[in-house]
């Protein structure tokens, strides 16, 4: 089942992100069998980070919550809001995804 995890940054996010970045990336690599897509939520300027968005393929909401609660950024208190919602895959056109992280 697909679950979308939407996370909004809280206070001191820049410092927490810098301190926990390597742990965060290692955690995502360890769980890449569950991770469909992940990336930073950005302000309209395309530079300022406002949070993170993850799309997981896991058996249940409990599994999505466990993944989120064990993620190093969340454990460090980076996010002021975390919302997890189940979704159904509708249209799927991965060929339309940008070729770079910046969206080009």
Question: Residue locations for each model-derived region?
Answer:
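Conserved, structured core segments of small domains
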Residues: 1-104
